[in-house]
Amino acid sequence: MEKTSVLIKSKELMEIYELKDGVPYFKTYLSGQWISGDEWQDVISPIDLNIIGKIPKLNWNQIDDTLEHIYRKGRWSIRDTPGEKRLDIYKKMASLLDKFKEDFVNVLMINNGKTKSAAEGEVKAAIERLLRADLDVKETRGDYVPGDWSSETLETEAVVRKEPVGVVLSIVPFNYPLFDTVNKIVYTTVIGNAIIIKPPSSTPLPILMLAKVMELASFPKDSFAIITIPGRDMNKVVGDKRIQAISLTGSTETGEEVVRNAGIKQFIMELGGGDPAIVLSDADLAWAAQRIAAGIISYTGQRCDSVKLVLVEEEVYDTLKDLLIKELTKSVKVGDPRDPLTTVGPVIDVKTVDEWEKAIKDAVEKGGKILFGGKRLGPTYIEPVLIEAPKETLKDMYFYNKEVFASAALLIKVKNIDEALEISNSRKYGLDAAIFGKDINKIRKLQRFLEVGAIYINDYPRHGIGYFPFGGRKDSGIGREGIGYTIQYVTAYKSIVYNYKGKGIWEYL
């Protein structure tokens, strides 16, 4: 295997790091300044666990100064930039992402362990999200409220404005560092908020490159910053009163920790998932098997909307099981994501694979039967696993109760849709679900009772750029992400009431 290293060809992007002994030391961006560090954090490729770069480990004084600058100046700089200009900036960012596409694809492959097609897909999605910011604009409009619906408010009227809350902290996950950051930038700043971005410690490089793109696109320099500190040091930041809203994509445990420490703020959180796929007796089984297999193995299961439970009506269980095993056998090729034949690359780190192994052992000890995969092929490489799980012990299994961020699915035979509903809804998570079948009455009942944020009919769950809103119920999140839908969580409503009593403007009957 060829040793991993960061390959950046664009001169503009090469300005954000210095090579020392062959290792790139990246700077971070704090409100108009590129900052190096007194301390450094290693960035490790999941492909071979090689150190591919170092990023600054900021201290509290640096973060405090940045918060103060953005609170005092930056939140007004972005608000005073006309909306038309903000849209132009997004378009420039999209153009620059396209210009630097090769560099971003290479870094996503090396830093995230993504296959080339997956990395290209993320860059494409980021570009499309920037270009579709115009669809968010209509949600920045306010309302007019007449006063003649109450005797107390006769001869008055009000305008209800939607205003930016001020400063938004955006905490980005490791799995889609470029797209998720772009998405958070658009819905946060399109209405005029300043943004502070906390990149994932494991995959920060695409975000630091994006900061350069923002600078080149003339994004208001005082209005954004990238704070590179470990997640364990974030409690003081999330609790800071200068931050008015927090946007987080991450685990349920991280979300709970943020809520405990943040105080009174607005939240938008997309948290733990791992979705059920329900297969009805009249489903197109070949199609269902193909789509479910894709939902299990896509990005090695490191997606919040990855398929983790497969619930199959007993009449077609054996057939679906055989077809699913065949699809996995045909689809899975584990290896170096730089190899164009690879379909399943590495998991992000060793500890996640350790947890995956532990969960498999737990499932087998509780009566589970491995139908496919389940082998560890290296420190960060796995064979996606399919486990036949008995209903009697299912709810005691680690995989059922905890989202494991690697390819794994439990296959369960159910008598009917009521049993499928009970098993699905008994989990603490409620992000998405998939239903495969034709019976509209069964599908309609499942739609009504599934406690999830989105349901995909005859396909596996995937959120894309957010044309359709998504988000979790129960422990899977707060609020909804989606084009035009998320602005409400980073918005303050302000009612401005005009009193015209006795001015002769209205003559009521």
Curated annotation (Swiss-Prot):
Recorded catalytic activity of this chain's protein: D-glyceraldehyde 3-phosphate + NADP(+) + H2O = (2R)-3-phosphoglycerate + NADPH + 2 H(+); D-glyceraldehyde 3-phosphate + NAD(+) + H2O = (2R)-3-phosphoglycerate + NADH + 2 H(+)
Binding positions for NADP(+) per the UniProt entry: 198-201, 231, 251, 272, 403
Binding locations of D-glyceraldehyde 3-phosphate: 175, 303-305, 463-464
Keywords, in A-Z order: Allosteric enzyme, NAD, NADP, Nucleotide-binding, Oxidoreductase
InterPro entries according to UniProt: Ald_DH/histidinol_DH, Ald_DH_C, Ald_DH_N, Aldehyde_DH_dom, ALDH-related_metabolic_enz, NAD(P)-GAP_dehydrogenase
Active site (record annotation): 270, 304
Positions annotated to bind alpha-D-glucose 1-phosphate: 79, 86, 161-162
Cystine crosslinks: none
Cited Pfam families: Aldedh (PF00171)
Residues annotated for AMP binding in this entry: 79, 86, 161-162
EC number per UniProt: 1.2.1.90
Activity: how regulated: Allosterically activated by AMP, ADP, glucose 1-phosphate (G1P), and fructose 6-phosphate (F6P).
MF GO annotations: glyceraldehyde-3-phosphate dehydrogenase (NAD+) (non-phosphorylating) activity; glyceraldehyde-3-phosphate dehydrogenase (NADP+) (non-phosphorylating) activity; NAD binding; NADP binding
Residues that, per the record, bind NAD(+): 198, 251, 272, 403
Binding site for beta-D-fructose 6-phosphate: 79, 86
Physiological role: Catalyzes the irreversible NAD(P)-dependent non-phosphorylating oxidation of glyceraldehyde-3-phosphate (GAP) to 3-phosphoglycerate (3PG). It is highly specific for D-GAP.
Protein family per UniProt: Belongs to the aldehyde dehydrogenase family.
Subunit architecture: Homotetramer. Dimer of dimers.
Name of the molecule in the record: NAD(P)-dependent glyceraldehyde-3-phosphate dehydrogenase
